Design a protein with these regions (language model features):
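C-terminal and inter-domain tail/linker signature
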Residues: 2-148
Length: 148
């Protein structure tokens, strides 16, 4: 049950703003959506980013790895201060991909397309917690880094 429809609409609009900023490699605008204490769980890689600087570094890694990356929200489901978003990400791997252990995989020049889901919680008009769910193996197979 939606307890505050106006607030939820604002929260889903913030998710849209965040994804649009990612799609435009506009890291500053994306960071403006995040709470200073935002914790971001990347379930595909197993990484956890805490605070603005770690989230900024993560987003810069994604936008450098996929210079033409587009993140498209397909559907929002909202309840209270939580927004669940189905999303589609596309991009061409034009830059080295930094892995969680700090190693780098050279660019493949291959295109990826994958769907996933983000669960985001909001506090004080900012994203305080987010978890992205996607299949890392799908992405690695599309990049030619493992058998399909």
């Amino acid at each position: 049950m939606l307890t505050n429809k106006g607030k939820n609409i604002m929260n889903s609009q913030l998710v849209d703003k965040f994804f649009e900023a990612m799609s435009n490699s506009d890291v500053d605008t994306a960071m403006s959506v995040l709470h200073d204490d935002c914790v971001n769980h990347d379930m595909g890689s197993g990484q956890v980013m805490r605070g603005i600087e770690e989230n900024r570094a993560d987003m810069e890694n994604w936008t450098n790895t996929f210079s033409d990356m587009k993140v498209e929200p397909l559907n929002h489901v909202e309840s209270g201060d939580t927004v669940v978003t189905e999303m589609k990400m596309t991009g061409v791997n034009t830059g080295d991909m930094e892995m969680p252990d700090g190693s780098k995989i050279p660019a493949t020049g291959k295109r990826v397309e994958m769907q996933g889901c983000q669960v985001a919680q909001f506090q004080d008009g900012k994203m305080i917690k987010a978890s992205q769910y996607y299949n890392m193996m799908t992405m690695m197979a599309q990049l030619g880094l493992m058998p399909e």
